[in-house]
């Protein structure tokens, strides 16, 4: 069976999509290729790295990347994590499913917000896996 591909997209590929990529690789395992990208690149937020480190997932080697049209068109599912990404996501071919999981941006907020959003992302991916 070929691996499926999931592509997490947010505004800057800095916090939410980075954490989603980390959780996706952990939870979805070998059955999925997991990628993340942004409408823009803001660099990986150090607090996102720390939040994931707290749950023993290392995203310190991740890079902040722009949407790659090749990956986008080869994806089975594109998940937008914020309204900006949802509104500005490129047009997808008919074979690519899109879902919007609106999550609050923790950037610039208290540490507890990073933890809360991290845990919300984990729950969303666990629920997705059960479908």
Curated annotation (Swiss-Prot):
Coiled coil: none
EC number of this enzyme: 1.20.4.4
Active-site residues annotated for this sequence: 10 (nucleophile), 82 (nucleophile), 89 (nucleophile)
A GO molecular-function annotation: arsenate reductase (thioredoxin) activity
InterPro entries cross-referenced by the UniProt entry: Arsenate_reductase_ArsC, Ptyr_pPase, Ptyr_pPase_sf
Main location: cytoplasm
Disulphide-bonded residues: 10-82, 82-89
GO biological process: response to arsenic-containing substance
Top-level taxon: Bacteria
Enzyme class: oxidoreductase
Any Gene Ontology CC annotation: cytoplasm
SMART domains: LMWPc
Protein's cellular compartments: Cytoplasm
Record's catalysed reaction(s): arsenate + [thioredoxin]-dithiol + H(+) = arsenite + [thioredoxin]-disulfide + H2O
Pfam families: LMWPc
Keyword terms, alphabetized: Arsenical resistance, Cytoplasm, Disulfide bond, Oxidoreductase, Plasmid, Redox-active center
Physiological role: Catalyzes the reduction of arsenate [As(V)] to arsenite [As(III)].
PANTHER family documented for this protein: ARSENATE REDUCTASE (PTHR43428:SF1)
Family, similarity comment: Belongs to the low molecular weight phosphotyrosine protein phosphatase family. Thioredoxin-coupled ArsC subfamily.
Protein name listed in UniProt: Arsenate reductase
